[in-house]
Curated annotation (Swiss-Prot):
Cofactor: [4Fe-4S] cluster
Similarity comment: family membership: Belongs to the IspH family.
Amino acids binding (2E)-4-hydroxy-3-methylbut-2-enyl diphosphate: 43, 81, 131, 170, 226, 228, 271
Active site positions, chain numbering: 133 (proton donor)
EC number of the protein: 1.17.7.4
Keyword match Iron: yes
Name of the protein this chain belongs to: 4-hydroxy-3-methylbut-2-enyl diphosphate reductase
Swiss-Prot/TrEMBL keywords: 4Fe-4S, Iron, Iron-sulfur, Isoprene biosynthesis, Metal-binding, Oxidoreductase
Binding site for isopentenyl diphosphate: 43, 81, 131, 226, 228, 271
Organism: Bacillus velezensis (strain DSM 23117 / BGSC 10A6 / LMG 26770 / FZB42) (Bacillus amyloliquefaciens subsp. plantarum)
Reactions this protein catalyses: isopentenyl diphosphate + 2 oxidized [2Fe-2S]-[ferredoxin] + H2O = (2E)-4-hydroxy-3-methylbut-2-enyl diphosphate + 2 reduced [2Fe-2S]-[ferredoxin] + 2 H(+); dimethylallyl diphosphate + 2 oxidized [2Fe-2S]-[ferredoxin] + H2O = (2E)-4-hydroxy-3-methylbut-2-enyl diphosphate + 2 reduced [2Fe-2S]-[ferredoxin] + 2 H(+)
Length: 314
């Protein structure tokens, strides 16, 4: 089968930095144990499973404050998605050692919210409800940040502030953000724009929007909790016009999807381990509709291949 390996795809620098920070923590014998990650360090189960094998435990829950209640001692790592000041304060009051793996692009948004709050603004924040990144951003200044996910949410807003700015979650589809921002502008003509789609997300979406047009099908390799992975599938269908499926790894691929498909495009979310994506590409490249021996779907990437290698400091 012909395979279009969409480029760029896969890991972004924020994800790599977060994983290196956590990997170094696992090697640091001076850190108090146990070591916990407050939520998924990045949204990929293969990554969290690999860290657990290294003795770093991922805690899950409805929000970061609730998750923190599970921790009585040791070290906590804040994920790439960022946390609110309230979570940081709660960890400090518990006497926990904290390690911050927040993506620099997320930190920029937090800094923006602090800045405009001091200047008397309210903020309309476009993001996915229930996702940890908006949770952290709204938590920076909950009294002035208004979370919206849809154009209907915008219509339901009742903001009286004279100074208003609109910004967004870094991993949203830039086309969705544009449409919602237009709705905001229609309701609040004086609003100021500050789009925060991170560059890695933007170029990956643009690559899919162009390169997937040449394929009969797009496969996005990414975790179901990964917002940017889900958005890539959306971009393939809505912008490139190519049917798309998101899979966590090769074991989730369905052979019936490949019926009547001659060319398949493959991309991966920003938190998807490269070996997982390569395994999918290898399968598709050798797949032959007429040869059943090429139809075996087997995930075989060991966990030790998932995490980045780091140098041990002497």
């Amino acid at each position: 089968m012909d395979v279009i390996k969409i480029s760029p795809r896969g890991y972004c620098y924020g994800v790599v930095d977060a994983m290196v920070i956590a990997k170094n923590a696992s090697l640091d014998k001076t850190l108090p144990r146990p070591i916990y990650i407050l939520g998924m360090i990045v949204h990929n189960k293969h990554v969290t499973d690999a860290f657990e094998e290294d003795g770093i435990y991922t805690l899950d829950g409805t929000n970061r404050l609730e998750i923190l209640k599970q921790v009585e001692k040791g070290t906590v790592i804040f994920t790439a998605h960022g946390v609110s000041p309230e979570v940081r304060k709660a960890a400090e009051e518990k006497g926990l050692v904290t390690i911050d793996a927040t993506c620099p692009d997320v930190t920029k948004t937090h800094d923006l919210i602090r800045k405009v709050k001091a200047e008397g603004y309210h903020v309309i924040y476009i993001g996915k409800k229930g996702h940890p990144e908006p949770e952290g951003a709204v938590g920076v200044a909950p009294e002035i940040v208004h979370l919206v996910e849809t154009e209907e949410d915008v219509r339901n807003l009742d903001i009286q502030a004279e100074k208003l700015i609109v910004t967004n979650q870094t991993t949203m589809s830039q086309w969705d953000v544009h449409d919602i921002m237009e709705s905001v502008k229609e309701k609040y003509p004086y609003v100021e724009y500050h789009q925060e789609i991170c560059l890695a997300t933007q170029v990956r979406q643009e690559a899919v929007s162009e390169q997937a047009k040449k394929a009969d099908l797009t496969i996005v390799v990414g975790d179901p909790k990964s917002n940017n992975s889900n958005r890539l599938a959306q971009v393939s269908e809505e912008i490139a016009g190519t049917k798309a499926y998101r899979i966590g790894d090769i074991s989730e691929l369905k052979l019936e999807w490949l019926k009547d498909v001659n060319t398949v495009a493959v991309t991966a979310g920003a938190s998807t381990p490269t070996p997982i994506t390569k395994e999918v590409i290898r399968f598709l490249e050798q797949f032959d509709h007429n040869d059943e021996s090429t139809w075996q779907l087997e995930h075989s990437v060991p966990l030790k291949k998932i995490l980045p290698k780091v140098k041990i400091k002497n």
